[in-house]
Each structure stands twice: as C-alpha cells, then as structure tokens.
C-alpha cells in the first residue's frame, strides 16, 4: 500500500492467485489493519472514489487508487505493512447439515466479522483441522477477524490426522500475527461481541488437542462431549486439550471427557 495524500492510497492485491476483479465501490466502509500485529488502526473510512491504477480496466488490475471521504490516520503509511478490509463485502454464514470427509487440508475455514453459525455437521476424518478461524495480512491476505461464531451440535470423528498448515487442534483459531508480543488489542472476538462459542458438540478423537486459540477475547467451550479412542496412534506434539495463546475471557465448563483429561495450557 502506498499513501498518496491524506485521503488517498494505492492498494494492491498481494496474493499472485487473486487479482483482476473489483475490490470495492464508492460508499463502501473499510478499515485498515496493521499487518505486523493484526490490529485495526484508526476509524472506519468510506470510499469516495476507487479506480484501477495499474490497468485501464478492472480486468487484470492488481492496484487500485482509493480516495476516502475523510482523512486517514497519521499512522497509516507505506513505512510498514497495512491491509485494507472491505467491511461491506463480508457475509453472514450459516453452515449446517453437511458431511465434511477426507479433506486433504482443513475441513472448513471461516473468516468474517459477521454472524457465523456452524451446526449439525459431521466432520469425518478431515486430514487437517476440522474448523479453522484464520486471518492474516502477510501470506494469504485473509484479514477478517471473527466476532460472532457459534459452533454447536456437530460431530467430529478422528479429525487432525496430518500436519498441514494450521493443524494445531480439531478446532484451530489461528490468526497469523508476526509480532504477537507487541499486540495490544485482540484479533478475534472483542468487547461487545459474543466471540466464539463451542457448545453441545461430540468429539471422537485418537489424539489430545481439541481447541487451539490465539489472540482472542471471548471463547466459550461448554456442554461438549469428548470421547477418547485408540483408532490411530496419537502423534501430535500438543499434548493438552486446550492450548491458549494470549486469550482473554475464556470459559470452559460443563463438559464430559471420557478419560477425564481436560488439560489446559496458557501462554
């Protein structure tokens, strides 16, 4: 991203497999995210004008000149990396009554700040994590934080049989944050939002990790049943049910563990 003046930037599609289509329209609300800490900088901005910058038309364009109605925050410049998230183009998600089976990588991936409900699904032998809540502005450039996610009444059968990307647990809340130690705000959840609620699910697992969560304010795990089996040899380096990195307002209650292991590690 390059700042041209106090109200104008040139934004660029960064991933080589995603460009050449419209990014935003006049009147759209956007926010700026510092790539290094994945924190929102300044207030929401409204697009006054947006045009292709490196091409005459949108087709094939990688760069857009974007002018905003109001001035930008002084911290936003090309001296450090920023992502621009279009808040108008974020969907609500209802994902229900599906069978997700034998995936090579993750079973499902959700990355939207709007309401997301995942219910009554069967996640059967997903090779990687069954459910991934991600977010990044350095590789895939999927910036969206999750504010309101409910995961309920699903069945997980021997997920996490391999170690692909983001395979920290059956449910992996894994934003990529290069400089986590200097992060002040939290990425997922946040004050005034429900955060992530995982309730009334059944986990059948041969290994230990059930939930991994990083940079989240608001995580509830309640009323779930975890059934340990010996279908495969346990192999994961994470030996705890719940591994938390910079997590706040976490509730783990009223769950059933067939082997009594409800271990938690906090970092």
Map each language-model feature to its residues:
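Extracellular parallel beta-helix/beta-solenoid repeat domains
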Residues: 1-267
